[in-house]
Amino acid sequence: MWDLGRELAHRGHTVTIIGGVGQRREPAPGVRVLMFPFINRYRFQALPLLRRAYAEAKLLERLSMAIAALPELISGGYDIIHIQKPYDLGPALLARRFGGARVVLGCHGEDFYPGDTLLAPHVDAAVSCSRFNARTVAARYGFEPTVVFNGIDTSLFRPVAPNPDIVRPADGAPLLLWVGRLQPWKGVDVAIRAIQDIPQTHLMIVGDGETRADLERLAQGLGLAERVHFLGALPRKRLPSIYAAADLLLATSFASETFGIGLVEAQACGLPVVASRFGGFPEVIDEGRTGLLVPPRDPAALAAAVRALLDDPARRRAMAAAAPGWAAQFSWSAVADRVEAAYRAACNGKI
């Protein structure tokens, strides 16, 4: 919302971002930020009845903030209240009832909970981050959201010089890249196993998370410790030069991926992608032109696709040249155009 808020403020809209007390970025000119206290979801999950009830605990966390924020939502004179998850439906609809604001529901995942189906039909407009996500939302709520892709900062993510700290293999071997949180459904093990079938190729893994130790043991056990390099989590501002140092980006998720922001950022930097044909990934790749798609959880298919591109440098260069132009549709300016259209639909009562 920070980047979208900046773009909307630049267009002359009066923008307020409301969130919980915590770390904050410096807001853009014209963007007001209000922070309210909340009760962390983990405190709710400490209660025996909520120990395994993530959605309900998250709902209570958001409601605890909404109690403090509700007077502002009602009396703030807002034309549009754009919520980012269904958890905020109740407070937003109260503000609609008593303050007159129109409510736009943003959906980026499957953040559903008991009772949300009673509230969602009362919003004025809804947006989803991909067609994949829109189908999920439509199946639950009975209406089709407008697809508004997530955005990227194209002033940051663009072709740049390679990071000088990334040392290419001395033998000139290809360098593959994986970027993201190390979690079970991200399928990083698939990328590591695929390396077995791509001789001399090296894999850089940027990110950290709960599966890192297991992945390091896997690489060691497969005899790939010298070819799989764990760089840990890096600041986003360093990623463009990391993308520039690689030959291909691998994206191997098999669950919980409604978009694929890292794939878009890589393409904006001129890096072709080989990704799972899953979730929102097929929507953010121009298949055959900026990257390839393979079946999820299939190391052999991933290795074959990577080899096909590594063995065809001309095709890979053509993909690299086409990728930034394709990624331009995900700029915050383009996203703001679609969001403004959704806001106009909300004001006209067209969901």
Feature map (PLM): residue ranges:
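Short hydrophobic beta-strand element within catalytic cores of glycosyltransferases
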Residues: 272-275, 285
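Nucleotide-activated donor-binding/catalytic signature segment of Leloir-type glycosyltransferases, i.e.
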Residues: 98, 216-234
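A conserved mid-protein helix/loop that constitutes part of the nucleotide-sugar donor-binding site
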Residues: 174, 178-197, 210-216, 292, ...
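Carbohydrate-associated surface elements
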Residues: 132, 151
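Short His-centered aromatic/hydrophobic patch
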Residues: 61-62, 83-88, 107
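Acidic donor-binding loop of glycosyltransferase active sites
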Residues: 227, 244-258, 271
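Short alpha-helical donor nucleotide-sugar binding micro-motif in glycosyltransferases
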Residues: 233-234, 241-246
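Conserved acidic donor-binding segment of nucleotide-sugar-dependent glycosyltransferases
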Residues: 287-288, 292-299, 308-313
